[in-house]
Each structure stands twice: as C-alpha cells, then as structure tokens.
Regions:
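Conserved amphipathic alpha-helical segments that form helical-bundle/coiled-coil interaction surfaces
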Residues: 24, 28, 40, 45-110, ...
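Active-site loop of classical SDR/Rossmann-like NAD(P)-dependent oxidoreductases
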Residues: 117-119
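Short linear motifs at protein or domain termini
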Residues: 1-45, 87, 152, 156-169
Length: 169
C-alpha cells in the first residue's frame, strides 16, 4: 500500500493513511481517458452484438442496484462496467495496469456516492453503451471524457467539506 501511495510509513513513528494526492488523481484520470477512449473505439468496430452482451448485463445489474438503493454495490459495478468494456476489447491487462494508480481517483469518487450521483453515472454508462452499439466512436469518446471528469465536481465538494483529506501542494 505504500507503493501505491495509500500508506505513509514513518519508521519509529507510525503508519498513516496518506492524504489524497491531486497530482496522482489527475495522472490516473489522464491514463484512464487515453485507455478508455481507445477501448470504446475498438468496441465501436464490433459488428456482432452478441459480443456486447456482457456490457448489457452490467447495465442491467446497475439498474437493479439503483432501484434497490444499493450504492456500495453500485460503486463496485461502476468499476466492473469499465473492466468489462476492457475485457470485451481484449485489453484487460492494460486496464489492470492502471488500476493501482487510480486509487486516489477512486477515493474521491467513494466519498461522494449519493443516490442522484449514481443515477447520473448509470445514465452516462448507458450513453456510452448506446454510442458503442451505434458504432459512433467520437460520441463515445466525448461521453467518456465527460464521465471521467465527474470527479472534478466531487473534488470541489470534498475540498469544502473535508479539506484535511487533501494533500497540500
């Protein structure tokens, strides 16, 4: 955990949870943006709609979580949706490579997981899936850019409510 900047170990003093590092947050968003836009481009080239069924299954599970107000489960399915898209595009290893550096990005997301926020995420996922099924890579890329920029709103709220969680420059 120290290697991915979650824990800060100070010999003979103690072990502490690291503050959220905004440079690492932006780095993770940057890498995810590059990867996920390329994944969506690959998926837009798929002609066999049966290959996209795992994506549809993820959306179905997310909708059920929303209907039953299961936000924690929804958070896991949010990550699973992106992982599933990577798997369909045969880019699972690439997705796993960036997974460890997105921990600070995920911390911001987790701290602001309200019901209405989950509904917005679901709608964005549905829009991404629709663009993929329409073979519209540009539209999918634009939605992904907006989707991965949601954290900025979350970050502003977090800075106001819990500034002590954020690492100073």
């Amino acid at each position: 955990l120290e290697g991915v900047n979650i824990l800060e170990i100070r010999p003979q003093i103690g072990t502490f949870i690291s503050l959220i590092d905004l440079d690492l947050v932006e780095e993770a968003r940057f890498l995810r943006l590059i990867l996920e836009k390329e994944i969506s481009r690959i998926l837009c080239e798929i002609e066999d709609s049966f290959m996209l069924m795992p994506m549809e299954e993820q959306l179905f599970k997310q909708r059920l979580c929303l209907e039953h107000n299961k936000r924690r489960e929804f958070y896991g399915l949010d990550n699973e949706f992106h992982k599933t898209l990577a798997a369909i595009a045969n880019r699972s290893r690439s997705y796993e490579l960036i997974h460890n550096i997105q921990i600070h990005f995920d911390r911001i997301r987790k701290l602001n997981l309200k019901r209405e926020r989950c509904q917005g995420i679901y709608q964005q996922h549905k829009s991404i899936a629709d663009a993929i099924k329409e073979h519209d890579a540009e539209k999918a890329a634009n939605i992904i850019t907006n989707h991965l920029s949601n954290y900025e709103t979350d970050l502003e709220k977090l800075k106001k409510i819990h500034p002590e969680y954020i690492k100073e420059d």
